[in-house]
Design a protein with these regions (language model features):
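Transmembrane alpha-helix termini and helix-breaking/packing motifs in multi-pass membrane transporters
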Residues: 64-72, 154-181, 336-353
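Cytoplasmic helix-loop-helix junction between adjacent transmembrane helices
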Residues: 124-148
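Cytosolic juxtamembrane N-terminal segment immediately preceding the first transmembrane helix
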Residues: 2-28
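Linker/hinge segments immediately adjacent to helix-turn-helix/homeobox DNA-binding domains
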Residues: 3-4, 26, 30-36, 40, ...
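C-terminal ends and interior cores of transmembrane alpha-helices
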Residues: 86-105, 271-284
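Hydrophobic core of transmembrane alpha-helices in multi-pass small-molecule transporters
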Residues: 108-129, 287-303
Length: 466
């Protein structure tokens, strides 16, 4: 386990904070611009370029999961995985950009472009799964906030790359995954948590419901990207407004410092997507970007929620993170693919946008209530109580602290939490800032493997049974 002295400092710490942002920018540039994609009018393919990318992305995550089962990291080492990721990512980005904008696009019926897309997608999947594996082990209680910072930074980088000339934008796109790898290397020095004291029972995790809800929500997102499209100017405004919404949400997370980050990321997803759909039909044409921007915000909250919860639950259940995290991303991309194909078909049929929006909102309501509500999220983190007559709280807290690698200060906070003390009381008692107290509580929850105070109390009650 890393110690405080090995943590990244200065520029390295900044890179570790926003390292994922370079990956997200890379994906946004590929999906939302023509930097790496050819003109749709000159493409030799019989399906849309976004659908082609999503198909390759699904296959990329499937291959990464398979490589994880074959112990790729054990065979070629940590450095080998990083080198392979970098080579595939750069080769894929440069290959896509060069082939897309030259006569090479028609060679072999587009075979060169397909090869470049395959390299891009596999490198993209390897990089994101590497980040997910790292997040699952971090001891800090604000992984969700770091995700929000990275995604917010990605909007700034996205507009920067879009403003570059084509050749420079292609070069920048190839450098983005390398920058993310550098940030990932620095983030490796951050403190890690030990295996959780009371791991989750995998049978208690509503896997099927979660995956179906994930598929449905991403399918709705895919439909929205094809049915509710505007002009280039409105798309720019939509991304700008979506970025501002995410910036405000990130600021809220840092000010409020919620100890339950999974729930904090879950709450805005359905309201943002549903309200975005509704606003598109209420607002005048010149203001449509507001609804589209809110949907972008909701879609990216969904992405971050998937990444945070799937990596954390895999670690707590002691399942291979590559398998759980990679499968969740595969299902998400498959949902986006189906939604994209359905959206294109509906657009070609000139289907009623009001009817499409109504159906999408209904699907979101079903996904967020019947399939995977906040109560299902609670089940993934709940520790079932087994009351004990033993009341030796100090000994129990000390045992939990030793097993989970809590610091001396966190042990003090744990002792107060065990007695039902609130964060403001703990701050006053220990003469520390309220935000510091909340960060200690959040870190304790993450290291111990719970997400609320009741589960922590239940775990302390169970301690004498060991």
């Amino acid at each position: 386990m890393a110690n405080a002295s090995s943590e990244p400092k200065g520029g390295g710490k900044l890179l570790s904070f926003v390292g994922l942002g370079f990956w997200q920018t890379w994906w946004m540039v590929a999906m939302c611009t023509d930097v790496l994609l050819p003109n749709p009018a000159s493409t030799p393919f019989h399906l849309s370029l976004s659908a082609l990318l999503l198909i390759a992305s699904c296959l990329g995550y499937a291959v990464v999961v398979l490589l994880g089962r074959l112990d790729l990291k054990g065979r070629i080492g940590f450095g080998g995985v990083q080198a392979l990721t970098g080579v595939l990512s750069v080769a894929g980005s440069v290959g896509m950009g060069v082939v897309a904008h030259t006569g090479l696009l028609t060679v072999g019926g587009g075979a060169l472009f397909v090869i470049a897309v395959a390299a891009f997608s596999l490198g993209n999947a390897l990089l994101l799964v590497s980040w997910g594996t790292l997040w699952s082990t971090l001891a800090t209680g604000y992984v969700g906030r770091l995700l929000c910072v990275s995604y917010t930074a990605a909007f700034v980088l996205f507009f920067f790359v879009r403003a570059l000339p084509l050749s420079a934008a292609i070069a920048a796109s190839a450098l983005l995954p390398l920058a993310s790898l550098v940030g990932y290397s620095f983030a490796q020095r951050a403190p890690r948590r030990a295996p959780v004291h009371q791991h989750a029972t995998w049978d208690a995790v509503p896997v099927a419901k979660a995956l179906v809800a994930l598929f449905v929500a991403n399918a709705v997102w895919g439909v929205s990207q094809k049915v509710l499209t505007g002009t280039s100017a409105s798309v720019d405004l939509a991304f700008a407004f979506g970025g501002l919404c995410l910036l405000a949400f990130t600021a809220y997370l840092f000010v409020a410092a919620p100890t339950d980050e999974p729930t904090a990321l879950y709450r805005p997803i359905l309201p943002a997507l549903a309200c975005g759909f509704a606003l598109v039909f209420v607002l005048p044409p010149e203001d449509l970007f507001l609804g589209e921007g809110i949907m972008i915000f909701g879609g990216y909250c969904l992405d971050m929620f998937i990444m945070l919860v799937s990596s954390d639950v895999a670690f707590r259940a002691r399942k291979p993170v590559v398998l759980v995290f990679g499968t969740a991303l595969f299902v998400a991309r498959a949902g986006s693919l189906l939604g994209t194909l359905a959206g294109e078909a509906l657009a070609n049929m000139q289907a009623s946008t009001v009817g499409v929006a109504f159906a999408c909102i209904a699907c979101l309501v079903v996904a967020g209530t019947l399939l995977f509500s906040s109560s299902e999220l609670d089940r993934m983190y709940r520790v079932h109580v087994e009351p004990s007559a033993d009341s030796l709280y100090e000994e129990k807290c000390a045992a939990i602290a030793a097993a989970c690698g809590l610091t001396a200060r966190e042990l003090e906070v744990l002792g107060l939490l065990a007695r039902g003390r609130s964060a403001p009381f703990i701050a006053d008692e220990l003469c520390i800032a309220l935000g510091t107290a909340k960060n200690h509580v959040s870190s304790i929850y993450r290291k111990v493997g719970v997400r609320d105070r009741q589960s922590l109390h239940n775990m302390i009650e169970r301690e004498s049974l060991r």
